[in-house]
Amino acid sequence: MKIYNKIIRYKNRKTSSLAFWWLQVKEGKGNYKLSQNQLDDYYVDFSEKVKYNYLFDKEGVPLLDYKGDIGIQYNPCAIAQYGLGLCSMWYETKEIKYLEKILVQAEWLIDNTVQGKNGIGRLEYSFQGEAYNQIMNVGYISAISQGQAISFLLRAMIILKRWDYMLTVEKLFKSFQYSIFDGGVVNYDEEGMMYLEEYPTIQISCVLDGFIYAMFGVYDYYLISGNDHAEKIFNDCCNTLKKRLPEFDLGFWSRADLYSKRVKMPASKFYHNVHIQQLKALYAITSEKIYKEYAVKWEKYQNNRWFSALALFYKCVFKIFYY
């Protein structure tokens, strides 16, 4: 049944959740050498997300159709990405039509942030995650949506001059101050290295794109708040990433996650490109050469048609037998 649902979602990708997720992510266009109290356009360009035109609620908030048992759902991460795309369009054009849409997405995220243990602001998912990622219950939170909501709400706050948004941002940031065992999204390995988990379970997954998007949210919060703990979290995560980045290199493609004792899952063509754009942004922010090194290497993989074909074949086999 799982394979059947995946086939249906792919076959109907123009009307499924893939209609949103597979909209191209491009290299960011902002200025990333910023000082305190400054934010520019987001670190990757989500403006293509604004082209999503399939399902919206009556207020204009995007809905995703996962087909099968999950059906049509709100996804906090998708809403934050759509909002960041709207912000990119506003930065580029200054057209007023984007302001109302930015407001709608921001208000949804604020209205749907619930307060949990330790005062943590939670953007909860109302549907189950994939069994592969060990998320079998509704009501879970994810570092990627928590982080991207922070990034979007801070930009919306500045664009709309809605300084009250900072209250929700501060609650969301608390999820990065607590471990998964205390209601947060942070996990640690045996060496004490920090991970911001897209799928917060006991076993460390270190999904690469989710980890980095979460780091961007922490970094944005640091820029606006000057919070020393946010700076430390970002630096600790950079140390983790620099140490483990070589493990994401399959020799012909990038790896999606670092689950141990599992067959290595290659990133899809879409997410391989996301990894490249994220690493370019991290290099622009930090000037750490390792990020540029892997961005260049993985871009060469991307431009090699044989490597691309091998990655596609490997991914299809993985999805059928292991996902």
Question: Residue ranges of each PLM-predicted region?
Answer:
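Glycan-recognition and catalytic cores of secretory/periplasmic carbohydrate-active enzymes
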Residues: 1-323
